[in-house]
């Protein structure tokens, strides 16, 4: 049994980490969150110590590491806001623990370079939650593409719309410097999945950017990808809005729907199982999507020219 600490317990993704820690037979001993609205802990690890200040949390896990008798923290799971991931990963490694971090691992490629040095200095590894890679449908599609030796280039339309209310624009998520923007917030797992299956980026074009919407084109080794991401519920197809739906997700591959709506419930647990078996995703697995999102963030939109997503034809200018 390993001892875990968790940074960021009040967010929506943290319970999946708590569940994964429990289902893999391990123990959560310490939690850091600036909010004390973390009653969800009672469902999984009611004996875990809660800290509201980073300094006291840091001191606590350091002291545990010196006590011996199996009390040291072996892994620190990180579910904090995007811009804090780098610092919290470093905190874990400084305390002789492995880090398990939610995506996006970091916001910029130079953060990855620094963390590689930190791994070498401490001898501890940084693991990464990329659960879509473990989805059965994604694995099956990757096997199909890998087996196709024809060199065919596939045409893909990625559309993801998830409505967000006014609260979003008052939170850290709306701050580009803290979140990385819309592509990092809601697009990162798709970009990772597509490059995992269809290969490296050869061209990255941005057609449209606003606070709530972004769209562009990616030329991958084995695919041409038109992508559209939005937080504006008005972009959800009208028939779905009439049903009260606020989210729409679609991936078309050569005009055929790629279906992977189900099978998400245990993916974090599977990710933890692989990490504990020494087979988890690492820093190198983050570089593609970090590079994509960083480039999009720093690139001006070119407008509706070239291979742009069809949803842009009707978007409010």
Functional labels for PLM-detected ranges:
Residues 28, 47, 73-76, 150-153:
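Local beta-strand N-terminus motif with an aromatic residue
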Residues 166-236, 287-291:
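Rossmann-like dinucleotide-binding domain that binds NAD(P)(H)
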Residues 83, 106-166:
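A contiguous active-site-proximal alpha/beta segment in oxidoreductase catalytic domains
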